[in-house]
Each structure stands twice: as structure tokens, then as C-alpha cells.
Amino acid sequence: MSRFAAPHAAIVGALIMAAGAAMPAHGQSAAGAIAAPQPNAASLPLIPLPARIERKPGSFTVGNGTAVAARGAGAVAAARLLTARVSTTRGITLVPGPSGPIRLVRDSSIKGEEAYRLTVSPDGIRIAAADDAGLVHGAMTLAQLLSPDDAFGQAVAVPALVIDDAPRFRWRGYLADVARHFQSIDTLKKTIDQMAALKLNMLHLHLSDDQGWRVEIRKYPDLTRIGAWRVPPTAGGPAPAQPYGGFYTQAELKELVAYAAERAITIVPEIDLPGHAQAIVAAYPELGVFGDRPAVSGNWGVNPYLLDPGPKGIAFVKDVLDELLAIFPGRYIHLGGDEAVKDQWQRSPRVQALMKAQGIASENALQSALIREFDAYLRARGRRLIGWDEILEGGGLPQSATVMSWQGEKGAIEASREGHDVVLSPAPILYLDNLQSWLPDEPPMRPANPPMTLERVYGYDPMPAAIAPQDQAHVLGAQMNAWSEYLTSPEIVWHATFPRLAAFAEGVWSPKPVRDFRSFLDRLEPQVKRWRRDAIPAADSAFAVGYQLDGTRSAAVASGQARLILANQAVHGTIRYTLDGSAPSPASPLYAGPLTVPLGRTVRATTFGTDGAPLAAPRAFDTSVAALLRTDSVTLSACSGGIELRLPLTPDATAFGPAFNSNIFDGCLAWRGAPLSVAKAYRVDVGRLARNFGLAHAFTRLKTYYPATTFGELVVRGGGCDGPPIGTFPLPDPATAPNRLRFTGNLPAGTTDGDLCMTFTAPLSGPLYAVEQVSLEPSR
């Protein structure tokens, strides 16, 4: 899917952003029938918070050599997971044995799918469940109780208690987009481990898209020989010599399915169709509409290639399904259905004749006919079709089809009203490729206004108020999606995913009455330490210190001092700072209010948790005149609105920077309120990026500037975006020039503070230009 974000607000607006049970319905579990926990339950280091916790007197100490007893394959597997998890997060070695003080048992008296009871007494610990999934969840809860702090390797006194727990929703999902940017099996296993720790149970693998086909299909070997590889787009000069891609063998995926199943996770494969099919058509042109062979796409967004809706295309999909069903034993098969622009079908005499012969009135109805065909094929084999909410648009959706609602919640509301099961996955709130803060060190992602912060994700309720009570039984749950156009490496994927996935996990597991964001933040502190033990580079964006200059930059330069307001997004922990650029410690001064700092100092600040450990890496604010007269791309905005993206220098860059705020529809960017009155000259650092965007019908919104030279110009205006140019710089030949450029010019005498606007007039058929940094030279 391609999701373009709206224009962002000023960075400072985001820095301080805080910040009687019924029987379970069809989509919900027994958790709704379990009483709320006692108030002191929130002090336990547990995410997600269990449905019910009863504290008891006493405790039981677990240390090296404590024995774990389990009988039956499921209990033994859960005990093995417990032992491995505790070894990693606490450094304690538990020992399996025929008997022991920690016991995992099957108990049919525990009611509800995935439910468990965890009992801690001075005599030992017992985990009981009626199914294997419940045993895994109980083991993960105990593992968290055994890692409450940073005392690695030390024994733990677990407080006596009884936990009765079960999930709020049956579908607690996470999507890994391995089509845009490939992820190794080892990376997926690491993600699965984290999902299990958070009691998520559905891993949605997006295995095909315009940019790549990722699963071995033996009947169609060119899907991976050709369709799994794309040539990275160029920003000028020769194309990269090495193609980008990869795929999974059937054996690898079967092994991954087993690995996930042991952790109570079902893998849901997605083959996207009839749109997002360019990799298929690149491999087998006869499966397209016109018979031409495109390249596997290097463009993000919406591309025109559709699957043939006739007998050839239908037979192909059924062949693929036959092989997928042998790999993935889960109930659901996802067949996409999103963003299929119908131009190719509309312009094909053959397709139009097919529609006429079958009495199909519209292209949307033709897509619905395909969905009905594949739904019947899957039902006959004991499976169920699930698709994105566009599968509703043509009408006649089979009752058995499940709808995943991404275009807000409207698809879920409509589908549940019509009697379909639904999964909530609305953009942008559950889209992890949206920025979680406006901190300048965030990697390239989709800007959101406001950012998709930890608190916003935590506050999302997967049961929309607009779904009528009689339809709520159709809500299976919800899913977060990590679309990977800009999530180019495991480190960036995990930065985007954690800790927001933990906030989401509590929303789909814990009963609504027990949830509280402040309590969640307290419980997140030990979870941050677990991620560090697991080598998961979770984002610290919610706790990182952001800076707001109180007043204008020009006023600070003129006065020789800066007044700074410090805050973190979550409004959590304590902020300590230094004024000499050194890293803050728990002994550093406590931030209690705005700081007035003589220019030339570097303020460095960190948020510390309740135990005195840092919750985020230090962030700095340089108060030198040079820094005050400089801005990075993150603070630039579109001159006249429009869609923005935060782009990497090259499409497949795996590092965290640089990042370029870009308006892909209008080549004009503005530094709002630039301190021009205290400057005499400017320098603009420019990056030349690949223009790799599939815009479909949105191409009509592209704004064209007439170039006065062969490759266009950078035009700088200092009196607002409609003012006269103060500098015009011809752009060099992209075929031979480097992809980072620098331009300098003088400001007219008497220039006052205002917007500094930079417009690129380069042809839309060539690369995309973006501003990396703007620097002003002080006038004195």
C-alpha cells in the first residue's frame, strides 16, 4: 500500500505533545468476563496488563538452578520458551526436570481460548491453561515478573499473587512488509520473539507487491527468478549494478511457520491482487492485461499494472494458492484487493468483452467477481479469505470474507453492518511508517500531523464507537502495519515498531477499564531494559528531550542569550542537563523550568527513569550563533501545502540519515520565519533524490515550474514564496554531477525576518531535488 501523509506543523508543536462485564463476543475473548485488577496491579512490570491480578502475602524466589517441570508437548515447549526468555532478560538459568517449584500444566477448568492462570505462592509457581497458547502467554507473563529491573544475573523474589488472564480480542496482529524491503528469516524470527513477549498472535506477511515477489512457487519459477529482483532507481548517472531483492524458499517458510506456531503465533500470507501486480507481470507478461513486460517496479505508490481477470489470471492465482496452502496451515489467506486502479481493465477491449459476456457492469464489480471466485476456492479447502477494505466496493462480497479496514474505520463499520468479520488496521494511527516525533534524528518515514506518538497509539480503541452493539461480535481485533518503503533495514523497522507496538498490544489484550497511559509508562521502563538485552533498538522518541527556543532566533542572536524550554513527548521521568556539552548523569542539574543560556553553550539533556537509569540517549541544543542561523530539512515545510514525505538520500539506504523533507507534488520548500534580519548571506545544501513515486491519478496535482536552463534551477526568495527571486542557480547535469550540491548567495540589504523559500524548477521527468540544510552568515 502507498500512504502519503499530510503536511506537518512546526516542530515545536510536536515536542511537548503529551501529552460490569458481558459474556465475550465472537471477536472478543473471555477477558471481557474477568474482573478488573486491584489498583496495585499496575505496579507490576507487565505489558500487556493482565485482566485480573490478586496480590497475596509473601513471595517466591527464583534464581540459578530453579527447576521447571512440564508434561506434554505444549507445556514442555512453553517451559523451553520461558527458560530461554529468562536467560536473555535476567541472566538466570532455569533447569528443566520431572518436578520442580515452577510447573506448567494443562488444566481444562481454565475457560477461554488463550486464557491462563498464573499462581505464585511461597511454595512455588504454577502456570495453568486449557490450550498451548495459554501456556505460552503465561510463560511470557512469568518471564516479565522475573525481569522487573536491571539486576541482571540476580535472583528475583516474585510477589505472591494470582493472575487470571485472557485476551480482549482474537486478532492481535502485526504486518511485516517484506515486499518493498526484504527481511531475512532471522530478522523475522527476532520479530516473532518480540510479538510473543507482547502476546500478539497474528503475523501478516506482505509477500508480493509491485516491487517484489518473495515466496517460491514451484509451478512459476520466474516469480522469484525475475519477480523477486528490482533495479534500484537512480537520481542521475548509471543505474546501480546490483539488483535489490530476495525471496524465501518453501522450506524456509515452513520452518518459520513452525517457529511462530511454537510461540502461539499464526502467519497470515498475503498475495496482493489484482493491483500491486507489477512483479507478477514482469515475470509472466501473459498474466497481465496487454502482454507487455514491465520491469519490477522501483517506484513506491500506486502503479498501473493489473492481473489478467480472465481464465489465465484465475488459474494462476489458484495454482499459487495451492502451494501457499501447503506452506501456511492457518485459517486466513490475505488476497489484498487494495489500490487497484482500473485503467488497464477500462482500456482493454478483451477485458471489456469479458465483462459484457459475464454481465458485469463495472470494473469494481469485476474485482468483486474475482474475490468471490477465490473465496469459494479457499472455502472449499477449509480456509477463509481476508482482504483490504476495497473488496467491499464492487458489492456482493461473500459472507465468509473478512475485511481488513485500512481507510480509516469506515470499512469496518460497513462490513460489520453487512455481517462480515473485520480487523481494524486504520491509517494513519496504526501505520508504523508514520513518524512518531519531529525530533531531527528520526529516520526517513512518512510525516504525520500530528505525529503518531506513543500516547496516540495507546489511546486507540479497536472497537469503534460507530459499530452497533449487535455488530460488535464481528470485530476480530486489530493490527499494526510496518509498511517498508522507508523502513529499509531491521534497525529502522524496529525503531518504527517499538515501543509503539507494546502500546498497541495492551490495547488489544487488556480489558479497557484497566488501561491507563501513565501506568503503562511506568511499566514500560523495565520493558525498555528488556529490549536492550534483546538487542532491539527500540525508539526512545517518547522520552527524548526536545528543545523549544522561547522567542525568535534573531532576537536570541541580538541579545546574546537563548531561553530554552525542555520537555519530552511522554511527559514522563525527570530531565537532567549539562551546559558544557557533556553527557548528563543522575547527579546533573534537574530541569525545573526554562533555561537562559549565554550563546555559545551546548545544552545536553536526558530523561531518567524512576530507578535513575536513562530512558533515552542525550539530545543537544547548540546555542552558537552559527547553529541558530542554521536549519535542517526536518524544519522545512511545503510552501503551499501539499503532501510531504521524509525521504532518504537513496531509496534503499539502510542508515538513519540524512533525511529530506520533500513535497513530491510541488518543488518549493520554505524556512518559515527565518532570521534574515541578522544575516547577510545564505548557503543551501541540496540533495538530489530518485523521483520514484507511483502517483496514479494523483499525477494531475503535480505543479510544473518552467525551467530557464537545461536541467532547471534552484530559485531562492527571501520575501515570502511569492516574492522576487534573490538568487537563481542552474542545476548541473544529473548524469555527471554528485548527488549533494551547495549553493551560496547574498541577502539584499535591509532584509527582515520572514520566510526563505527555495523552489526547484527541474523537469518532472528527472530527479527530485530537496534541501538538506540552510545556513545563514551573520551580518556581524
Language-model segments: residues:
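Active-site beta-loop-alpha junctions enriched in small/polar residues
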Residues: 179, 208-212, 272-276, 338-340, ...
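Active-site neighborhood of glycoside hydrolase catalytic domains
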Residues: 280, 285-286, 295-298, 302-400, ...
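Bacterial N-terminal signal peptides
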Residues: 8-20
